[in-house]
Amino acid sequence: MTHCAPLIGDLHQRSPIFFAAALSRWARAACAALLPVLVAGCVTLTAEPRALLQQSDGTVQVQSLACARTVSLAAATRTTPRATGLDPATIRILTWNIHKQGDRGWQDDLQTFAADSDLLLLQETVLDGTLQQMIDAAGMRWVMASSFIYENIDTGVLTASRIEPVASCTQRIVEPLLRLPKSAVISWFPLRGEATTLAVVNVHAINFSLSLGAYRAQFDAVVDALSQHEGPIVFAGDLNTWTTNRIAVVDAAAHRLGLTEIAFTDDRRRLFFGHQLDHIYTRGLDVVASSAIAVTSSDHNPVMATLRLTR
């Protein structure tokens, strides 16, 4: 389906036009809004959720990766310890909303972050040739959940890694008001010498809605996809937690999965209406180091952590 309308950026992004409303009362009143318009054009929304996977030969395969099918595959991989995989003693992860690669300096920052990461979780990713070449040059493989296609280029969330996942699935949910989807990638990675796998969730959460229904449904779907996973989990991304009610939804999902949020002593995460939007939650992992890195190359500051498997 092709939807010809203004392509709307995230509510919190820098723009000459800002949404004006009493957002703390958002669920009680449908407030008039002015939205930051990026460009006008035609956005293609595929009938089925669209996933893109980089193959071992460098080609890109487009397919549907429904989580209902993939979860059983991931569970079947828990058999014997693997000789190859992520180092369970040192897992370096970074999550970053890259703002559609629209800010100066993103290439230099991404190159640095990719070199220092085992897992790179990107949101608002435009899968153009420049981005693909940079990830390839970093020696990483990737899988993407496409939210929509604009000017024949996919935009969505992308997980890049130094080790190929044993399984991945994608989820997509449509924003209630803007009708543009938000997406998630869930991947299961082998851990060297371990029988279990590490589940990694990369989420760009719904931003613009009058109620919490769709927002809660997005997190419920992720929880359901992880219901059979007994091993460690990383749950991260731009969760758009700009109200206390949204934070409560995320906390409830985290509680169901036994997740703990990583804290930051020097917290440089960007704020929107007094709340951080970018988070990393974990289960079965110890935090060795964590930080939020101040940048000018996006409207979000990347968040990183070094983790190790809990013994």
Range-by-range predicted roles:
Residues H3, C42-T80, W188, D224-I233, ...:
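Metal-dependent phosphoester-hydrolase catalytic domains
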Residues L7-L11, S15-T90, L191:
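Acidic, histidine-bearing metal-coordination/catalytic regions of metal-dependent phosphoesterases
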Residues L52-T80, L119, Q123-T197, I293-A294:
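Structured beta-strand-rich core segments of catalytic domains in phosphoester-bond hydrolases
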Residues S64-C67, T90-W106, F148-I149, R172-R179, ...:
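Acidic/histidine-rich helix-loop elements
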Residues I91-I98, L110-Q133, S187, A199-V203, ...:
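Active-site beta-strand/loop signature of hydrolases that rely on acidic residues for catalysis
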Residues R192-G213:
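Metal-dependent phosphoester/phosphodiester hydrolase catalytic core
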Residues L212-D224:
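Alpha-helical scaffold elements lining the catalytic groove of polysaccharide deacetylases
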